[in-house]
Design a protein with these regions (language model features):
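Conserved alpha-helical "signature site"
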Residues: 1-164, 180, 184, 191, ...
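Alpha-helical transmembrane segments of multi-pass integral membrane proteins
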Residues: 160-175
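Acidic, His- and aromatic-enriched active-site or binding-groove loops in soluble protein domains
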Residues: 171-178, 230-234
Length: 338
């Protein structure tokens, strides 16, 4: 039977109440992934890396292990585990198996589609991050990969508890371009990014995740300055302008910003490949990589196709589908077709 997860009654209206609610939601795991991982844990020939690779096909499994390893009662170090392999090593296989046995495992068709759609966006973001940045920052590939996969994870329990609210937010903010602050105050009583930041801190997610939310909430002036430079069509002039402000250059070139760039590329692409929001993040990515907009667009399209080959699922939308559409065509939200 499908899992009953939607919370009845009125949605919370304060940050504290939202965090308390989302902390209590149990996110289901696809049964086929669950069975494969449990078999690997019980096979003494499999390494932690083998198990981590199997787990990454189920974002909910990854999140559960990271949360457990980074919980204050379990964390043996002050800093959160930045990768799944480190988290598994902290827990050990026995405790990891006990954790998995507590998780709800369901046939994938019984997992609510709003949750699966947002997890697909996270998987697409992880592919974009790995393809665009991991080869250039090879020693940091695990931080890039896992941080990108988990960046939007605070939205996953929200997709279970109040799917209609999240769906309405996507319709009005992502598709219709309404003012996010007004819509979010009306729907949630708080800003979505502030809620995600609070949940990420409560879960002690990797620092690159919380740093991304801090940038969006507290460092928007610097982001606007960098975007202004990124709009300059002369690449040499771009670099000269950035070099003229060393503090801004250091701020923008932080490796943690790869997580934010990849997730905004993946989220904006849900509408279509020709929209102003996506263009802004493509321009910022081009400046970060010190290459042209055309080169970044080509790379992003290639990574979208690679993600679709690995992650696309029946009845879910993947932006790679839109690569064969007319360039200016955008994906309408289902409620826009009524």
């Amino acid at each position: 039977m499908p899992i009953e997860t939607e919370v009845s009654g009125q949605a919370p209206r304060t940050l504290e109440a939202w965090v308390k609610l989302l902390e209590s939601v149990r996110i289901p795991v696809p049964k086929h992934s669950y069975d494969r991982v449990m078999a690997a844990i019980n096979d003494n020939r499999r390494s932690l890396r083998d198990i981590a690779e199997l787990m990454q096909d189920s974002p909910a499994l990854v999140l559960s292990v990271m949360r457990e390893a980074n919980h204050p009662t379990n964390a043996s170090q002050a800093e959160p585990a930045e990768s799944l392999e480190i988290a598994l090593n902290r827990l050990g296989l026995e405790r990891s198996a006990l954790l998995l046995r507590r998780l709800p495992a369901l046939p994938i068709e019984d997992i609510p589609p709003v949750l699966r759609q947002f997890q697909l966006i996270s998987q697409h973001a992880s592919q974009q991050a790995s393809g665009l940045f991991a080869s250039r920052l090879a020693r940091l590939w695990q931080e890039i990969h896992w941080g990108s996969l988990l960046f939007l994870s605070p939205l996953w329990p929200l997709a279970l508890a109040h799917p209609k609210l999240l769906d309405t937010w996507e319709l009005r903010v992502i598709h219709k371009g309404e003012d996010a602050a007004i819509v979010e105050q009306e729907l949630f009583g708080v800003r979505i990014m502030a809620l995600c930041q609070a949940v990420a801190q409560q879960w002690r997610l990797p620092q690159w995740v919380t740093q991304g939310y801090r940038l969006l909430l507290e460092e928007r002036d610097q982001l606007a300055q960098v975007l202004n430079i990124a709009r300059d069509e002369d690449l040499l002039n771009q670099q000269q302008r950035l070099d003229a402000e060393p503090g801004l250059r250091r701020w923008f070139n932080q490796p943690a910003n790869t997580v934010l760039l990849a997730n905004n590329l993946a989220l904006a692409a849900q509408v279509g490949w020709d929209n102003p929001h996506l263009l802004r993040w493509q321009l910022l990515t081009a400046l970060y990589l010190q290459t042209s907009l055309e080169d970044v667009q080509q790379q992003v399209h290639q990574q979208a196709a690679a993600s679709a080959r690995r992650h696309a699922r029946l009845a879910l939308f993947h932006p790679a589908e839109a690569l064969i559409w007319p360039w200016h065509q955008r994906r309408p939200h289902p409620d826009m077709l009524a």
